[in-house]
Amino acid sequence: MKKYILKAFMLVALGAGMTSCGDTFLETDYYSGIDTEDALTSISKISTALNGTYYNLYHYSFAGNYAINIGDIPTDLSYWNGKTGHFDGIYTFTIVDTDTYLNSIWEYGYKVADNAARIIEAIPALYESATEEEKAELELYLAEAYSLRGYAQLMLTNIFCHQIKVNGTDFSSEPGIVVINTPIPAFEKVSRSTIGQSYEAVLSDFNNAITHFDTAGGDRGQLQYFGKAAVYGLLARTYLYMENWDAAMSNAQNALNAADISTLTYGNDNYKALYNSETSNTESMFALAITASQNWSANSSGTLWSSYNYSPSPKLQALYGENDCRTSIFAWDSKSTPEVPIFKGGKFSHFSSGNPAYATNYIVNAPEMFLIIAEANLYSPNGTINNAQKALLTVAKRNSDITSIGDLPSTKENLMSFIKDERARELFQEGLRLYDLRRWDEMAEVNATQAPNISFVYTNYKISNLVFPIPSAEVNTGYGVAQNENWSSTLPQRN
């Protein structure tokens, strides 16, 4: 595998400060193996390694920007005004296997997975000499390590592999990722698992996380650390992609129960307040520890959706009703024009400071759970139209013109069409649109142009075929990672 050097990062305290860590157990080549077998020999070192793993998760190369925004940028929801050159290759589908963004996502995704695997492997050896209190602490760390690895491998599978299910068609036998069950010995040849095996590994990690949270007596109860609600939410998302409707419904409800959320926020002022700061979103179950004092500045998601010139597409803007509170966070720079729009951040506005670079990424959120329950009810033999409508209404009431089930469609086909649009309206900037379009087998419109008109360079694009390339730097090392065959043929062609 390609030898990316794991820099010795640690997070002294999530949300408090990022500094360099001198522990050499993090100074290893991921995929080149473990330098020593007994490096993680104390609870304090486990804690340090776990914080380092969170740091890699939060990095702008992964969940802090690239791995999230790649789920929105090449879709019908985003608009690039052409004034800067960020993500432009992805947006315009002039994609190459040396793409910087894909390379960074691959690198940091595997940093998270590899470091988490080291922690998971090391913890059992510390149990024998640990006190009961220390065992509970180790169980908590183990739960979070499983959560981190599961999330990283889910993201890597979605980005670098085919969708596991596309409108009922199974692609689980297609090439998946290199699954990191245990740290890989130095210079060992590897191979890609199937997509199905990759998803099995993800589910196993999330289920193990829940088990160890229970054994630990609960989670930390802090938004910037993985906890039970977030993991249930990720299980729901994973099962949704697998079209396991009953499991998707039950885990989405488990997430809402664990977070003690039964309704959402309505009204312009209240909705806008959700995005005041890095901890203001009361609907969120997991967010990154990005703050006004510790952030990625020019490399932040907020910068991408403001001065780096991405904004909601004219198509997306047209989907909102006149009285939809979600448009309360849509604001435009003083230099913005209809033809050259300059957005001010949206969900990354960080209204308390007015600086989008300070904004966090809210990763797992309650509205997604209600929408999962709604969609799953339409397809599960145990679901009902009425239950789908009730779950959907909780989100759809963001538009104050919708007040009751009677304002929603009453047939499966029309209700599903509404859910598709509602996921666009609600989940914009959360990085889920690409996977929605692929799994629904939508004939997509991408590369929006000619604002303020609704116009796209590519239309009628079978986006479910889209597979990004594995970075050539990885493939060319000769450690066994095969390229996605014919990936370039899955890109859209001009009509």
Each language-model region and where it sits:
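Conserved, well-structured interaction surfaces
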Residues: H86-F160, S193, I210-D214, G218, ...
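Hydrophobic-face positions in mid-chain alpha helices that act as interaction patches
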Residues: T48, Y225, E243, M249-P367, ...
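Bacterial Sec-dependent N-terminal signal peptides
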Residues: M1-Y31
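Acidic, glycine-rich segments characteristic of secretory precursors and extracytoplasmic regions
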Residues: C21-G71, A273, G478-N495
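TPR-repeat structural position
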Residues: Y199, W245, G383-I385
